[in-house]
Amino acid sequence: MVKIFDADLIKGHFIVNDNGKRALVDTGCPYIINDENKYSKPHGELYLNDARSNVDPTISEFRGLEYFAQHKVLFDYKKAAIIVADQGDDVAPVHPVAEFAISGLPERIFINLAIEGKVRKMVFDTGASIANYLTESIAKTGTPCGTVEDFHPQKGKFPVDLFSLPVEVGGETVDIPFGVQPTDIDRDVQMSGAVGVIGVGLYKNFQVLVDLPNKRLVLGRY
C-alpha cells in the first residue's frame, strides 16, 4: 500500500495527520514516541515535550526509525508531502540523481557525502530542519553566510553561525550552509564516527527517499 500525506511544514519539520495522531516524522529519532510509551523510551518524555514546546503543541507522536524500518518514505518539501510505501511497494523520486548506502541502523542513518571534495560520514536527520552541522574544524573552512537560532532537546535554544560549503550530488555541486553544534552535542556525533548532521540542506534541494528495508537513500531533482 502507498499513502500520500499532506505535510504541515513547521519550522521546516514534516508533520502529518495519520490514524488519529499528529506525527512529527523525524529520521534523527530511533523510536516511535507518544504519550502511551514516552516513559519507556530513552529521553522519550523530553523529546516529546521539546517538540511540543518548540515546533507544535498539538504533536502527539514522534515518528522515528522504528516506523521507517518497515516502510519506504519519500520527503517532498516543495509539495509539502510525504509518500509512504509498504516494504513490497514501489516509490521513487521523479528524477533520481544520486543513491547512497545507509549504515548505522537501527540507531541512526549514516551516509557518505562528498563535502568540499572529501568524502565525509554524515548523519541524515530530517529533524535538522533549521541548520545542518559539521564539526568546527570543517565547517569554518566554508564561507560565512549568516546566523540562525536553533534548538535541541538537551540544550534549549542557541545561535548558530553558518558557513557555506560545496556538496557534490550526482555529478553536480550544491552550496549548503553548515553550522557548529554545541560542544557536547558535536562530541556525541563524532563519537558515532560521523563528522556532522544534514537534513534541511538535502530535502530543500532534493526529493529524498529513505528506503530502510533496502538500506539506501535516494535523492531526486525537484
Residue positions per predicted region:
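Pepsin/retropepsin-fold aspartyl endopeptidases
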Residues: M1-Y222
